[in-house]
């Protein structure tokens, strides 16, 4: 069985290997050394992308024991992967040969019974190996390990589920039985996607109104050495500036004729805290008219102090292709995107610009479709009737229709280097909880805080899609209603947030 410190080293550097490993070359060597067999090779080669192949190789090595770790290190050195070999060097030792009986193979239960300690006549003792490897670590690697240890020691606290959490999720056996509601219960969204209970976080109450606010201790950080090892300018956007960039949040809550967007304050507080932790300077604007939204975004785009990236978050009512101001005047979303192009935002030319839109895009409601939950299926979060509201003008059966023939901004083509994350698909409503905020923003904060350290933004938003689609639902009469976010990406490279704790990283 592979030592835990070695498993951890491979796990936390999985992003490095997935970007720089030559899978075909390494796979041949590992098969020749009898670390992997032909069946393993078939599984790896069946992966859809090169990056998935690289990850599968690392996972296969993890499953094959300590001898596989050392053979993997030797293979990296022999094939010219010197940078990757340096990652493993502190815990590695070279070997001259291996035999199948030295491997741990989870596909063959008998191999577990045959596993044994390495013969002293062949290798030095495990204690000696560990001591020698530590003494050979360079000062750079030692500092990196210190930083990582400190980061882990200050990670978020965990707590078990309490009775007050029960209305937030249901088991597969009673997935359509609503539970009593309590505005004072804590949201534990990670349980809905099957995350380990040790990763479950609690959301603090910021006021008597039970706003569940994201805090800095909820963020998983990455350290500077990892960032610079991973970065590839040909395939990744730069995102190293201090601050990372500017973030504008437009939060429309009170409208002239449309209903108040209860719960949007929780969205604003959560998303602003999230991006502050990621290194952005956040500016919030509340209750803007249609014209004021355009002028504010125009000024934001022309700002002279932009960093390596920019973020725009819009929390409002909406319809398909439009955002509605507090004066009930609608603004075409494509006009907003046009303000962010290179001509109107020269400081942001060739830089990633991320737009998050929490608003309805129509009046349709997604009734979902029945699926049979397996034993480890994803439980859904049941919202009591009357708590979840839509962000569309025709919500609640035309009870708050705005006047027609309002001004609509012209549509213009959007440009490259822009990513738009919509809370819902075109023509459908999006849902918002009056205490916890919208489903979409809750999921963004949960997923980004956990995985922004090693996932690019497209991967992150795919996880958000999964969390909203599988982890939330509400009821309207006898109908169970669902929501599906949508991602539109015009990025030309991968974009990583790489949230960096400046206090700990300064020691590197």
From Swiss-Prot:
Superkingdom assignment: Eukaryota
Coiled-coil stretches: none
CC per GO annotation: caspase complex; mitochondrion; nuclear membrane; perikaryon; perinuclear region of cytoplasm; presynapse
Subcellular location: Nucleus membrane; Perikaryon; Synapse; Mitochondrion
Catalytic residues, chain numbering: 317, 360
Biased composition range(s): Polar residues: 118-127
The keyword Electron transport appears for this protein: no
Residue span of region Disordered: 106-130, 148-184
Keyword Protease: yes
Post-translational modification: Autocatalytic cleavage removes the propeptide and generates the catalytic subunit p17 and two non-catalytic subunits p15 and p13; autoproteolysis is induced by ced-4 oligomer. Cleaved by caspase csp-1 probably at Asp-146 and Asp-376.
Renumbered residue ranges of the record's region Required for interaction with ced-4: 392-407
Chain positions listed as propeptide in the UniProt record: 1-223
Physiological role: Acts as a cysteine protease in controlling programmed cell death (apoptosis) by proteolytically activating or inactivating a wide range of substrates. Component of the egl-1, ced-9, ced-4 and ced-3 apoptotic signaling cascade required for the initiation of programmed cell death in cells fated to die during embryonic and postembryonic development. During oogenesis, required for germline apoptosis downstream of ced-9 and ced-4 but independently of egl-1.
UniProt domain comment: The CARD domain is involved in ced-4 binding.
Oligomer status and interactors: The active form is probably a heterodimer of the p17 subunit with either the p15 or p13 subunit which are all derived from the precursor by autocatalysis. Interacts with octameric ced-4 (two ced-3 zymogens per one ced-4 octamer); the interaction causes the autoproteolytic cleavage and activation of ced-3. Processed ced-3 also interacts with ced-4 octamer to form a stable holoenzyme. Interacts (via large subunit p17) with csp-3; the interaction prevents ced-3 autoactivation and delays ced-4-induced ced-3 processing.
The protein, known as: Cell death protein 3
Classification of source organism: Eukaryota, Metazoa, Ecdysozoa, Nematoda, Chromadorea
């Amino acid at each position: 069985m592979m030592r835990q410190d070695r498993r951890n080293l491979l796990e936390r550097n999985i992003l490095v290997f997935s970007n720089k490993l030559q899978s075909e070359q390494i796979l041949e060597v590992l098969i020749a050394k009898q670390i992997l067999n032909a069946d393993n090779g078939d599984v790896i080669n069946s992966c859809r992308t090169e990056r998935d192949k690289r990850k599968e190789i690392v996972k296969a090595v993890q499953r094959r024991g300590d001898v596989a770790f050392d053979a993997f290190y030797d293979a990296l050195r022999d094939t010219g992967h010197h940078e990757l070999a340096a990652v493993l060097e502190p815990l590695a030792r070279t070997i001259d040969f291996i035999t199948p009986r030295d491997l741990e193979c989870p596909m063959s239960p008998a191999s577990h019974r045959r596993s044994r300690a390495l013969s002293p006549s062949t290798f030095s003792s495990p204690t000696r190996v560990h001591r020698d490897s530590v003494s050979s670590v360079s000062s750079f690697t030692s500092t990196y390990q210190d930083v990582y240890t400190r980061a882990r020691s200050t990670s978020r606290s965990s707590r078990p589920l309490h009775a007050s959490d029960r209305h937030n999720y249901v088991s597969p056996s009673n997935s359509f039985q609503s539970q009593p509601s309590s505005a004072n219960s804590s949201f534990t969204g990670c349980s809905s996607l099957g995350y380990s209970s040790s990763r479950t976080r609690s959301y603090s109450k910021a006021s008597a109104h039970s706003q569940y606010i994201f805090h800095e201790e909820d963020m998983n950080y990455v350290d500077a050495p990892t960032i610079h090892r991973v970065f590839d300018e040909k395939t990744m956007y730069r995102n190293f500036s201090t601050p990372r960039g500017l973030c504008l949040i437009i939060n429309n809550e009170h409208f002239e004729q449309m209903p108040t967007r209860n719960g949007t304050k929780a969205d604003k507080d959560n998303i602003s805290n999230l991006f502050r932790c990621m290194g952005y300077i956040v500016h919030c604007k509340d209750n803007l008219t249609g014209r004021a939204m355009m002028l504010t975004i125009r000024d934001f785009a022309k700002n002279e102090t932009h960093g390596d990236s920019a973020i725009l978050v819009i929390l409002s009512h909406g319809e398909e292709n439009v955002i509605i101001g507090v004066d009930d005047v609608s603004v075409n979303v494509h006009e907003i995107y046009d303000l962010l192009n290179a001509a109107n935002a020269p400081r942001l030319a060739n830089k990633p610009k991320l737009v998050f839109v929490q608003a309805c895009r129509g009046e349709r409601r997604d009734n979902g479709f029945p699926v049979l939950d397996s034993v480890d299926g994803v439980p859904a979060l049941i919202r009591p009737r009357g708590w979840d509201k839509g962000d569309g003008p025709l919500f609640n059966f035309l009870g708050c229709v705005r006047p027609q023939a309002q001004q609509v901004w012209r549509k213009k083509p959007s440009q490259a280097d822009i990513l738009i994350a919509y809370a819902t698909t075109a023509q459908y409503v999006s849902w918002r909880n009056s205490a916890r905020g919208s489903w979409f923003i809750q999921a963004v904060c949960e997923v980004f805080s956990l995985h922004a350290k090693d996932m690019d933004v497209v991967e992150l938003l795919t996880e958000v899609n999964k969390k909203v689609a599988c982890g939330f639902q509400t009821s309207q009469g006898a109908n169970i209603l669902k929501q599906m976010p949508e991602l539109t990406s015009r990025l030309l490279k991968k974009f990583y947030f790489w949230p960096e704790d400046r206090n700990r990283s300064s020691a590197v």
